[in-house]
Amino acid sequence: MVDSSPAVPASKSVGPTPTPGAFEVQKSKALPFDSFNPTGRPKVCNPLRLLWNLLAAPPVPFLITERSNARVRSLIESLSQDALILNVGAGGKVLAKNVLNLDIIPTGSTHALASVFALPFPDQAADLIILQGVLEHVPDPRRAVAEIVRVLKPGAVFYTEMPFLEPYHEAPIDVSRRTKFGLAMLCQPLTEIESGIHIGPASTLAWVMREFFAALVSGGHPIVYRRASSLVGWVLFPLRYFDYWLERYEHFHRIASSFYYIGRKDV
């Protein structure tokens, strides 16, 4: 989840208060399993219900390949264990033990609550900042990038991803899209190291076709839309596997689902 308001909320830590002046933030504990079953009664496994839930939730229509995951992993592993690495808008994702997860909504892996517009760190503090699927959800992405640049050390690296042809998806709002070159322009305060396709064109096709047919047959009825989306999703999701091959070809940037950008702050 990411910040959807230009207002700058005061940041606060989740869990024990961190040592003043230190950059470590104590990791919050995940909710115990019993908290999801407040009655305390044993749950009965219903095979038909499990099958229905499975059919109601097809695999996602997009493919994030190991090549994409390896880019982020290599950036993290290139730094020492005491480097300050921030994953802003992390949601529940854990990239590595030495990465601090920031978000405006707490999860079991959130280290601190903070807005992307007001990171709780001084100038030139971070060695690496990661934003995955965040910039499209904020009302002022240029302001967000400016805050990232403020917190980066000279010579430090910024990694981000942003959609181009992904269908609308709220988290909690969905604001903007960028071409490969538009994303580079957004990050112009930095010097580009590398950029390219993050999620390929086959995922674009699978996702757009799912949304099109679900919207077409639903007539605007939300329940019919959800069921149609699930049914069509099961039929179309295999298309995404073509991206293992297609994302290697740069000319597919014209119809890519999303792009990544890696930039360095000038010394």
Q: Could you say what each language-model-derived stretch is?
A:
Residues V25-I76:
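Class I SAM-dependent methyltransferase Rossmann-like catalytic core
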Residues D3-S5, S13-T17, A22:
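Short, positively charged low-complexity motifs
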Residues E66-A70, T110-H111, F242-W245:
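Short gly/ser/thr-rich secondary-structure transition/capping motifs
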Residues P58-L75, G133, P238, H251-F252, ...:
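N-terminal capping/interface segment
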Residues R142-R143, E147, K153, V157-D266:
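S-adenosyl-L-methionine-dependent methyltransferase catalytic module, highlighting the catalytic core
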Residues A70-H169, T179-F181, G263:
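Conserved SAM-binding loop
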Residues S13, S28-A30, D266:
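N-terminal cationic leader/targeting segments used for protein routing and processing
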